[in-house]
Regions:
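Conserved TIR/SEFIR loop-to-helix hotspot centered on a Trp-containing motif
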Residues: 49-77
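C-terminal interaction surface of TIR/SEFIR-family domains
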Residues: 94-127
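Conserved N-terminal substructure of TIR/SEFIR domains
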Residues: 1-42, 78
Length: 127
């Protein structure tokens, strides 16, 4: 999914910065977000990486890794809500107590591409 999103952004003449591909130079992921936060828009990928449930419940659901959720919130703090979109692949639980956060579902119809472009246009991207 990451590669597909990268290719899509490049097709729009936007060069993505993929934090996991950048040199760490001894930085934590939060320090890398701070270092690379001079950007106009952020995209976070929520994928079925973990499984979790409320204590005492047998209703387990897929979740993005908890560090992804934290980093998503941190990125919103740096860029503001309207400059960050989360792409959700699969049946992934998303935090439901953060109002105004944009979650875009990825499915076979590839409608996510139009949704992401729409969000980027609102903040001034000519895509």
């Amino acid at each position: 999914m990451r590669l597909e999103v990268e290719d899509f952004l490049r097709a729009l003449n936007i060069e993505p910065i993929v934090l996991s591909q950048q040199p760490s130079s001894g930085k934590t992921i939060i320090e890398k977000i701070e270092y690379y936060s001079n950007v106009g828009f952020g995209v976070v990928l929520y994928t079925e990486c973990d499984v979790g449930a409320k204590k005492g419940s047998l209703n387990h659901r897929y979740r993005a890794r908890q560090n992804v959720v934290f980093e998503h919130g941190f990125l919103i703090g740096k860029l503001t809500r309207n400059r960050v979109a989360a792409l959700v692949k699969g049946n992934v639980e998303t935090p439901n107590d953060i109002s105004g956060v944009v979650y875009i579902n990825i499915d076979e119809s590839e409608q996510w591409k139009n949704e992401l472009k729409k969000e980027m246009r609102v903040v001034g991207y000519n895509v």
